[in-house]
Amino acid sequence: KVIDIHAHIYEKVAGITQGQPMSSTSQGKVTIGNREIQFLPPSFERSCSTAEALIAYMDWCGIEKALLMPNPFYGYHNYYFKESVKKYPDRLRGVALVDIMKGKAAAEELAQIYDEGILFGMKIEVDSTFQCAPGTRLADPKLAPVWDCCEQYHQPMFIHMFRREDIVDLELLAKTYPHITFVICHMGADICFR
């Protein structure tokens, strides 16, 4: 079996990067703030990456299953992930994404997602998430409701860490929340950006 454990799909780009809104235009282009950049190949006419396109690429490459991995860079697409997983249940699984900066409201959204039983876990992109809240750290007490929810439901946490202090915080979280499996994606990526 070949499984892609890090696939992205989105109906449109509606996220945030560099502290600015990012949105789809056409021919693979997106706007970031007031400037337009080529984000995808021009063949991506609507500047989106659909579940159907992913399934076609998977078939072409001989990939049996894929794990849909969200990112605030593209926007919050839990609904699209859920619909795609329901449409292709033998091919796709999906990880949830919530705005953890909302604290208790984010935890309530996660609990609802977990109760539905379609998506699992949670993804956090530290750099994108905290750009809008400088000085916030993974172990910040205002984020505790989110970690408490993941702990209660025994859900894994997929983390893209970009900052050295995230390692210290992750160690503290792992000791505090023993029922959360922390999956580190792209360890050491901050070196590329400094």
Which stretches of residues belong to each language-model region?
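Mid-domain alpha/beta scaffold segments of enzyme catalytic cores
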Residues: 1-137, 141
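Catalytic pocket-lining loop regions of alpha/beta-barrel enzymes
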Residues: 120, 136-194
